[in-house]
Amino acid sequence: MPKMKTKSSAKKRFRVRPGGTVKRGQAFKRHILTKKTTKNKRHLRGTVAVHETNMGHIAQMLPFAGL
């Protein structure tokens, strides 16, 4: 059986919190920002938790995260 490996892209994009939830950065804040309102850009700051329906995919990509 081959080695289990962590997906490098997931390793860079997700962080596991002590409680077992996973945080991620928000999308739509990289470019084409002139047409977005200041309020919209402000709400895209920071991180949010990954939704429960996606946690199975995250657990497969991060096998050693203990999810």
From Swiss-Prot:
One of its GO terms (cellular component) is cytosolic large ribosomal subunit. One of its GO terms (biological process) is translation. The keyword Ribonucleoprotein applies. The keyword Transport does not apply. HAMAP family: Ribosomal_bL35. Belongs to the bacterial ribosomal protein bL35 family. This is Large ribosomal subunit protein bL35. It comes from Leptothrix cholodnii (strain ATCC 51168 / LMG 8142 / SP-6).
